């Protein structure tokens, strides 16, 4: 068959398109054939435009589900009261249901910073004072600048020295010092109060001891004019909201695993720190795994599993986030399902 005959038989049209699957906005060229098929070039990923012949079933992506569930407590647009801006970064990825519920129950309006992207990151990068600090910390600067641009009344990022101690066998439940104290860095580098007239509130709190938690939050919220009784009621509601969120994650992870076992599907526990569910931080690794037809669960599935690891691991188990990863690794290693594997993000 002559080349001219082939070209005539397979006539096609071309199109230039912009992929809106993320903020990169890749320029994609499409070749559309008469039989309804298409071929794409210029795409840097296969999230929207791809040339796969057989589209396989995507796996469950619990990173995406966790992100949506975490930030489902956002204040309604018509809410009144002082606007409390909360940056979407670091320790907020652990306790946002608590803080969102607390402030709303006290009559404040919660304003969450925008989702992470390169544009948001670049708005704060000039205020980063240490180049060797971790990327999640650098990203916090962009989130704070986003809240400043949106004109909130106050910005809130607390000193959380201790997280909840989830296991009695663990030595302690310290937070990473960067996660705990980054409010002080923001105050020094951006100076929201001095330069923009927006105070940055950073009360010292501990989730390890509920009595101390209530005392410290009462002292802080009294300063904002909230009555004592309302404060204590709000804290109770906030603790319930946080626990409901954690319980939902655990149930969902175990359910995904059970469903996968029933159909002999592969499951990867993508163990990570809370802020790794930010798509910009984890580079959509979870999405890439799910695109291969593999179910992705989080370390939350092992919340009440694998506590015996503390007597065997050769490490000082005093850090809240790594303690969970130790438990998750031990649980996956001991699990009887042969298609359950673990990947850790660092």
Predicted regions and their residues:
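An N-terminal assembly and electron-transfer interface module characteristic of large anaerobic redox
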Residues: 1-346
């Amino acid at each position: 068959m002559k080349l001219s005959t082939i070209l005539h038989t397979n006539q096609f049209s071309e199109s230039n398109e912009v992929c809106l699957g993320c903020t990169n906005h890749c320029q994609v060229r499409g070749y559309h054939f008469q039989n309804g098929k298409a071929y794409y070039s210029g795409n840097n990923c296969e999230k929207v435009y791809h040339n796969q012949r057989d589209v396989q079933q995507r796996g469950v992506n619990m990173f995406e589900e966790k992100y949506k569930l975490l930030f489902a407590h956002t204040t309604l647009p018509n809410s009144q009261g002082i606007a409390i801006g909360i940056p979407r970064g670091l320790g907020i990825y652990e306790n946002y249901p608590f803080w969102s519920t607390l402030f709303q129950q006290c009559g404040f309006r919660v304003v969450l910073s925008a989702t992470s992207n390169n544009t948001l990151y670049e708005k704060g990068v000039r205020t980063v004072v240490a180049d060797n600090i971790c990327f999640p910390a650098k990203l916090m600067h962009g989130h704070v600048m986003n809240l400043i641009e949106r004109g909130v009344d106050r910005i809130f990022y607390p000193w959380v020295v201790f997280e909840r101690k989830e296991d009695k066998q663990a030595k302690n439940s310290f937070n990473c010092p960067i996660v705990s104290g980054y409010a002080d860095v923001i105050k020094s580098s951006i100076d929201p109060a001095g330069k923009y007239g927006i105070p940055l509130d950073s009360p010292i709190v501990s989730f390890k001891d509920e009595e101390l938690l209530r005392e410290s939050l009462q002292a802080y919220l009294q300063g904002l004019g909230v009555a004592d009784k309302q404060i204590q009621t709000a804290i109770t509601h906030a603790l319930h909201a946080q626990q409901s969120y954690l319980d939902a994650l655990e149930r969902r992870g175990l359910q995904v695993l059970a469903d996968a076992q029933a159909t002999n599907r592969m499951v990867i526990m993508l163990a990570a720190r809370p802020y790794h569910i930010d798509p910009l931080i984890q580079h959509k690794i979870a999405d890439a795994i799910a695109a291969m037809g593999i179910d992705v669960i989080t370390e939350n599935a092992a919340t009440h599993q694998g506590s015996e690891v503390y007597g065997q691991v050769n490490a000082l188990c005093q850090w809240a986030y790594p303690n969970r990863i130790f438990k998750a690794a031990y649980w996956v290693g001991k699990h009887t399902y042969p298609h359950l594997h673990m990947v850790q993000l660092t």
